[in-house]
């Protein structure tokens, strides 16, 4: 059963696809690590060289948007990034969990944060899973950025109100 969520945080279960649709813990731990690293992101530029990801498999996160915070007037302000549709992010996984693959942010997205997820279109999913694509998708231009309430800082607030544009 797919459950809507409006405030997923690291270490919670996220919906992923890796040939089948299922939930996984959003916190990646290398198979060799004796202590929990709980990695939530991986840079696409270095993922093939980092020992942490040597045996990782690819997966795809399914979502409608994500949050980033920007420091404004000495406070952190949350923003919601969306295209108002289901979209997909490149990820890595193992038996211990999963993480989002990021790249250098482009355009308006870079005004909020210097990194962004690798965003995929539906027809790119199989190429991502097989590792045969450079992922220069134009979907980045379709992402809208909404200033939202600071209520998202509390994981107990998990309602549609979180993704309403702040006035």
Regions found by a protein language model. Name each.
Residues 1-167:
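Short linear sequence motif anchored by a di-proline
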């Amino acid at each position: 059963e797919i459950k809507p969520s409006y405030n997923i945080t690291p270490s919670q279960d996220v919906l992923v696809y890796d040939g089948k649709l299922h939930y996984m813990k959003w916190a990646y731990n290398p198979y060799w690590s004796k202590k929990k690293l709980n990695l939530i992101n991986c840079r696409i530029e270095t993922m093939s060289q980092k020992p942490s990801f040597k045996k990782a498999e690819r997966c795809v996160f399914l979502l409608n948007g994500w949050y980033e915070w920007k420091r404004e007037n000495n406070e952190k302000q949350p923003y919601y990034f969306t295209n108002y549709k289901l979209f997909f992010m490149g990820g890595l996984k193992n038996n211990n969990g999963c993480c989002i693959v990021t790249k250098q942010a482009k355009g308006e997205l870079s005004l909020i944060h210097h990194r962004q997820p690798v965003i995929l279109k539906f027809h790119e999913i199989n190429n991502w899973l097989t590792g045969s694509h450079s992922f220069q998708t134009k979907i980045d231009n379709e992402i809208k950025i909404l200033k939202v309430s600071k209520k998202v800082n509390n994981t107990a607030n998990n309602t549609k109100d979180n993704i309403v544009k702040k006035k």
